[in-house]
Amino acid sequence: MRHSIRRGLTVASVAVVSALALSACAGTASDPGSTEDFEPLTSIKLQLQWLPQAQFAGYYVALDKGYFEEEGFDSVEVIPGGGDIVPQDVLANGDADFAVAWVPKVLGTLEASGAELTDIAQVFQKSGTLQVSFTGDGVEEVADFEGKRIGSWGFGNEWEIFAAMAAEDLDASGVKITTQDFSMNALLDGDVDAAQAMTYNEWAQILETENPETGELYTPEDFDVVSYEDTEGAMLQDAIWADTARLDDPAYADASVRFLKAVTKGWIFARDNPEEAATITYDAAIAAGEGGAFPVGPTHQLWQMNEVNKLIWAGGGFGVIDESAWAKTVKGALAAVNQDGLNLIMDEPAESAYSNEYIEKALEELEADGITVDGEYTPIEVTLTKGGQ
């Protein structure tokens, strides 16, 4: 069953595909470094890493507000992901034009498969990963992981843990990495000593849960939190990836710039209007039906929007890849060794693994139109409620 929401956005509960049918083509950006004539692309697909939630608000806002239409696209599909969907594989197989995925996950895929993909915009400038334990359980820093049950979702999300451990000379064999689901139940049920969480999702989930000892919601003071952003294992996360070989095609390169312009406008709107952006994303999650991300309550989505903005807007231009942060991510990926003694990567990635050429062109054109493309985010106050409703 399909449910319609604003501007023709649709989300299928099984296929979970968001689509926007737009009108006539607008002006296009020129391909960086090419003046060759070409027929502009007007139809594209974007593969997300996860289900509809404010982690991806900028893309849903761009759909809702017509920003893709403004950049000359007739049809845009935003395809939500899930635990069994690997965005970089979808992109490499030609089933999407662009994909959103964490940098270390893609680096591992590139080395293992020989695929060639390029990070053309680094949406998240900071790591949002946490390791959360109950206060007093003795897990206050990465060095405390030794001998503990450390929860992780797997699916490539665990490598930041191993990178942080490697920086502390902590052997993975001395830590029990325990698979947890995409909730905080493993911590609440005592199955792990510290659970993996994102600042914008699972951390809110546990603060939306009632403490059985008090009858009130848990508070931050009930927990010790290790933020990977504050460790040497911090890695770059949500990035927009393109097909490296196709970037030699002037039509695809041009579409990449126009796509990034629309996405940038979406994220700028989400920064300046977090409440409305959260509502737009909530509508998309509701339209996804039972396949929607858990939990999809409006208060939870507003919390998520607030926290995601903190990861994106670090003061520089939107989406620009910081060379030092990239180098730190690569260093962590090279050092990370899992509990089975396997490395994430053994060699430095190719130079083509990232490029600022396309995002810088997009920002330049937006600035020429009078749009401010950099800045910091001023957080709003969000009061969590039970279940995020």
Give the residues covered by each predicted segment.
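Surface-exposed patches in mature extracellular/periplasmic domains of secreted proteins
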Residues: 78, 119, 177, 270-281, ...
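Short, solvent-exposed loop/beta-turn-alpha elements that line the ligand-binding surface or hinge
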Residues: 70-72, 142, 218-233, 249, ...
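Short, glycine-/small- and polar/acidic-enriched structural segments
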Residues: 32-180, 185-189, 193-197, 226-228
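Conserved C-terminal helix/tail region of periplasmic/extracytoplasmic solute-binding proteins
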Residues: 327-389
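Short helix-capping segments at alpha-helix termini
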Residues: 67-71, 168-171, 211-218, 288-292, ...
